[in-house]
Amino acid sequence: MTTVAQKHFLEGQTYSVPLIQPDLRREEAVQQVADALQYLQKVSGDIFNRISQRVETSRAQLQAISERVTLAQAKIEKIKGSKKAIKVFSSAKYPAPERLQEYCSIFAGAEDPSKQKWPRHKIQSKHRMLDEKSLQEKLKYFPVCVNTKIHQEDDAEEGLGSLPRNISSLSSLLLFNTTENLYKKYVFLDPLAGAVTKTHVALETETEEKLFDAPLSITERGQLDRQVAENYFYVPDLGQVPEIDVPSYLPDLPGIAADLMYSADLGPGIAPSAPSSAIPELPTFSTESVEPSQADLQDPGLLPPPPPPPPPPPPVMPTTVPPPPPLPQPTAPSEPARTASEDSSKTVPAASVQGAPKEVVNPSTGRASLLESIRQAGGIGKANLRSVKERKLEKKKQKEQEQVRATGQGGDLMSDLFNKLVLRRKGISGKGPGASANPDAPGSPAGAFARMSDSIPPLPPPQQPPGEEDEDDWES
């Protein structure tokens, strides 16, 4: 009967070819060699079959990729010479499966042929006798390492020695209430105090412990350099771009589209952009030029006075001209001066522009249209303006009325006291009701001041040229 050598398996190893042992009988060695060669043939055949299947699978995948490349190349060749703009849509996701296929080993599912039942052979020859001489010859070629070193016992024993035979439990082996094995390492330890474990050698050689040396930053008065944190963020840079002086448009170029202005349904955008409805659409205005009337070109002295015109419609203003600000209301003495200036302004252009073109006589500029709109609005005479002095007097009267109401509505002690103090101050200053009731009394200071002010003649009003009044005193 043949014996097969023991096989040693590795991690992930599927096949294992047996080795033939030496010093076998001839018939036994021949049988083991035949069985090993037969096993090796089966293993090699299985390995090459699996490699061929994997190569065929990879070749099919490569063929599919080649077909896709050929199809894409044909599409590129078809549109290569076209001059029309082509819209290309890109997929939002990468064209790959969500879950990648895991790698499968080429030997997945393989079975070891050695697990099959081998035939049994009956050997007729007998074993040879052991020969010491042949064994000594083999030791020359097959070195045998034998550890002949004698283990020397340790002189310094730390524990109590070997374990006694009468120990029957773990509690009798360890020191009470601790995890120390005294037979292995003898320690001086109080089981109830929980002190630090110290051997008798450490107790004998124990010395005073010193503090560690100070670090170099303290002893040498050195300062550590602050490390600058490295920035690993991606900062794109345009880099060096060469300057090329070429025209902006080159017609009839091969492979360049000429009809870039095309309309197509783009659909919803990918990036979050601002909605187009946020920009308001401005209305369109029709700009009408203000044509001068023929009456302005004629002499106003030869024409009869025109009838009162109807109320004019709102003037059509250009989009760029702002509305005119209101002008101050003139006083009565400035009316004749204004009419005289208007008559002179009408007569002077009529006399100086004889034979001039229409555009020169009446320029249609923004300033002329602004003056025309002011004339149509009525000018200074129709403006509803009010003097600032009148407004100040009204505010003063309103303030006095509020104070009188406050004095009449007082109900508590503090308000009555406050009102009396106010009346006393007014009486002292000559502004109270007592002073105004009897201004001619000899002891009243208000009456004396009033008589002195009456004796002083009023100042004449300042003479101002017409049209140069202070505009700060007028408010709409």
From Swiss-Prot:
Gene Ontology CC: one annotated term: recycling endosome
- Biased composition, Acidic residues: where in the chain? 467-476
Q: Name one GO molecular function term.
A: actin binding
What keywords are assigned to this protein? Actin-binding, Endosome, Membrane, Protein transport, Transport
Residue ranges annotated as compositionally biased, kind Pro residues, are 302-333
Q: Does the keyword Transport apply?
A: yes
Protein's name in the database: WASH complex subunit 1
